[in-house]
């Protein structure tokens, strides 16, 4: 009887160790994946902010007051986006929560607004933007599209990871339940014959 109790404790300890190991591996995976993606997003946001500053400094002589206001608005949005990425990086362990999902949606919306702004500037500024400014607008539009694609990929990957993790844990729990049930049956047979 003592041997059976020891076996039960050993199996419970083994299950607890496996759960702890799975939890550690999951946290490590999330940490590495999130760090790389947030580093890429932060770099893109910094490049956008640098572009706005450069465009504002070199375009004072031919940008209208309306275009100046739009540049200021876009620069403010880029700064907000950079601040969001820094905040998301600092709280990466919680990025799969509902709050992080909402922030990802907010960042995607801001990226779409930036893309719409670039398209509007390109359409309304053909008569006074130089060839250099046109090239910079195209570069910024490409960066905004890449940033939008990154956010969509991050959201899809997060959902796929959550689904795969949930399936794996469900299968593992089912297997452990069946193993425990068989052990109890064997225990019953060994005690009562």
Curated annotation (Swiss-Prot):
Which UniProt keywords are given for this protein, alphabetically ordered? Answer: Gas vesicle, Repeat
- Cross-referenced PROSITE patterns: GAS_VESICLE_C
* InterPro entries assigned: Gas-vesicle_GvpC, Gas_vesicle_C_repeat
Induction, per UniProt = Gas vesicles are abundant in low light, and collapse after exposure to high light.
Glycoprotein as a keyword of this entry, yes or no, is no
Location in the cell reads: Gas vesicle
Q: Which residues form a coiled coil?
A: none
Of the GO CC terms on this record, one is: gas vesicle
Protein's job: Confers stability, involved in shaping gas vesicles (GV), hollow, gas-filled proteinaceous nanostructures. During planktonic growth they allow positioning of the organism at a favorable depth for light or nutrient acquisition. The ratio of GvpA:GvpC is estimated to be 25:1. GvpC strengthens the GV wall, probably by connecting several GvpA proteins in the same and/or adjacent ribs. Removal of GvpC by SDS reduces the critical collapse pressure (CCP) of stored gas vesicles from 0.23 Mpa to 0.08 MPa.
NCBIfam families listed in its UniProt record:
gvpC_cyan_rpt
Name of the protein described by the UniProt record: Gas vesicle protein C
Source species of the chain: Dolichospermum flosaquae (Anabaena flos-aquae)
